[in-house]
Design a protein with these regions (language model features):
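Conserved AMP-binding/adenylate-forming core of the ANL superfamily
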Residues: 1-42, 46, 50, 67-72, ...
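Gly/Ser/Thr-rich phosphate-binding loop
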Residues: 183, 290-298, 307-371, 384, ...
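Conserved AMP-binding/adenylation subdomain of ANL enzymes
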Residues: 229-246, 254-295, 309
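AMP-binding/adenylate-forming core of the ANL superfamily
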Residues: 386, 397-411, 430, 436-437
Length: 550
């Protein structure tokens, strides 16, 4: 593990994690309790998170882009007992913003009160396994918190949150510093920590990943230890991650791509972790050269920015050998440039979602560039994919429908949300993803869009992702997103929000004229707006609701 001048071995990391686990036990954390982490990609995130999990807790990662109100929502929804939080990040005091948000009344967030004795693992929906802990465990945690009464913990309005640990040397009154927290576990014998870790069952929940909420309030997908380990052993094998690799982890730890395809994959394969708290092209280029980085997963925009950086030639990027990307349209030209200009041996695309452990399909090493760019690869071992019509019936290859997934990685359910779970998972265990896709004869999956993003132009179904892929072929387009807008004659038409390449003088009329030559008429955007950048969430997905609201 490398963080600036700090370099620690796996043995040293293990010792730090055990100490954090001892501190969690000393703080009263019991198996099944939820522990949240709200911090950027740092060594302290890794140690605090793995320490909590080793103590039997269920990890609840919080998005670093959250405001205080959003963080408080997840903390209330999960009833987290312990929170690890960074002090100040990117000029924002997380502690202050959370304190302000937690002081508001509880009734305005649409949550149902969860009284003492509520079984955390009950009612997650049909066709799914056990949820988070047992009813007794949940009752114990809730009774402890409930005895304090609303607003009597360190943060008013978060009665279940008993302790807040600031990952810094200083902490406000009623909070604890990281140093003080760790010292609290020094009296816990190492054997106690190891017994606690050894008692964790494979089918026990390891984490609750709250979905990005691009279409509504976040919901928590419950994933088990066995699911996480099996998924990312498969991911590591298909990607070719190996001992000795040096992995620049730019994907945020609060996201499956950073936590599981990053931290867990490195731990299982013995790769060196080099976390980067914020993506900055100059910093990434410097890190790749200085740390001899060999592995760099991330969204397509990350790799595009590296390729287009004017100072790229001043950095030695020759050690890069593996790129895994996805979460957005991947232009064929991007794959070709990564292979041709940077000589990266393995460039792969993949598809996944939190509700399926973050991985469903993946290209294979040796796939041609056209397959890697145009599809997200084939189902991982142990997974079945169905392209379903509106009645749930399987469609043949080449026809678009909703992607359904069945396999070892499908979530146990949404945390304490039986109605939403029943909507997402069929009684026989199929997960409805909400994504529109097509399977080719070789079993490769092409995601054409979200069902809710599709719009209808004069009776024709228009899929923004397909149109974006075509627009991305224009030599002056660096990034693009398409949404449907009302039209008095056709019902809806497409509008493109485009980012021009540096130095381009491309006009809206130019792009529309080009589109008429390159795609069917109903796909042609009727309006184009050029922007400096597209709004994206931390996983790289375009926030189309923000574009529609403009």
């Amino acid at each position: 593990m490398v963080e600036g001048r700090t370099r620690i071995t796996y043995g040293q990391l293990g010792a730090r994690v055990e100490r954090a686990a001892a501190a969690a036990i000393a703080a009263g954390i019991e198996p099944g309790d939820r522990v949240a982490v709200w911090a950027p990609n740092t060594l302290d995130w890794i140690v605090s998170a793995l320490g909590a999990v080793s103590a039997g807790a269920v990890l609840v990662p919080l998005n670093t882009r959250f405001k205080g109100t959003e963080a408080a929502y997840v903390l209330r929804r999960s009833r987290a007992r312990l929170l690890f939080v960074t002090g100040t990040f990117l000029g924002t005091s997380y502690v202050a913003s959370l304190r302000r948000a937690a002081g508001h009344a509880l009734d305005g967030d649409g949550l149902e009160a969860a009284g003492p004795g509520t079984g955390v693992g009950t009612g997650v929906g049909p066709g799914v396994g056990p949820g988070v802990g047992t009813g007794a465990e949940a009752a114990g945690a809730d009774t402890r918190a409930g005895a304090r009464g609303p607003g009597r913990g360190p943060l008013p309005g978060l009665p279940h949150l008993e302790q807040v640990v600031v990952l810094a040397d200083d902490a406000p009154a009623d909070f604890r510093t990281w140093k003080d927290f760790l010292a609290g576990g020094d009296a816990v014998p190492a054997e106690t920590v190891r017994r606690r870790a050894a008692a964790i069952r494979p089918e026990a929940p390891s984490d609750i990943i709250f979905t990005s909420g691009t279409t509504g309030s976040p919901k928590g997908a419950v994933i088990t230890h066995a699911q996480s380990l099996r998924c990312y052993e498969v991911w590591s094998e298909l990607a070719g991650l190996r001992e000795g690799d040096r992995y620049l982890i730019v994907n945020p730890f609060f996201h499956t791509f950073g936590y599981k395809a990053g931290i867990l994959a490195c731990l299982m394969r013995g790769a060196t972790m080099v976390p980067q708290p914020v993506f900055n092209v100059d910093t990434a280029l410097a890190n790749i050269a200085a740390e001899r980085i060999s592995v760099l997963p991330g969204p397509p925009t990350l790799h595009q920015s590296l390729l287009d950086h004017p100072q790229r030639g001043h950095h030695d990027l020759s050690t890069l050998r593996l790129v895994v990307t996805g979460a957005a349209v991947v232009p064929l030209r991007l794959v070709e440039r990564l292979r041709g200009e940077l000589h990266i041996a393995t460039v792969l695309t993949a598809y996944g979602l939190s509700e399926a452990g973050g991985i469903v399909t993946m290209c294979r090493r040796g796939d041609p560039a056209e397959v890697i760019a145009a599809t997200s690869g084939r189902a991982i071992p142990g997974t079945r994919i169905r392209i379903a019509d509106g009645d749930g019936k399987a469609l043949p290859a080449g026809e678009a429908g909703e992607v359904w997934v069945s396999g070892h990685h499908v979530m146990q359910g949404y945390f304490e949300a039986p109605a939403e779970t029943a909507e997402a998972i069929t009684p026989d265990g199929w997960l409805r993803t909400g994504d529109v896709g097509v399977l080719d004869p070789g079993g490769n999956l092409r995601i054409t869009d979200r069902i809710k993003d599709m719009f209808i132009v004069g009776g024709f179904n228009a899929y923004p992702a397909e149109i974006e892929q075509l627009l991305g072929l224009h030599p002056d387009i660096a990034d693009v997103a398409v949404v449907g807008i009302p039209d008095p004659r056709l019902g809806e038409v497409g509008k493109a929000y485009a980012v021009r390449r540096p130095g381009s003088t491309l006009t809206a009329d130019d792009l529309i004229a080009w589109s008429r030559r390159e795609m069917a008429n109903y796909k042609v955007p009727r309006a184009v707006e050029f922007v400096a950048e597209l709004p994206r969430n931390a996983s790289g997905k375009v926030l189309k609701r923000e574009l529609r609201a403009r």
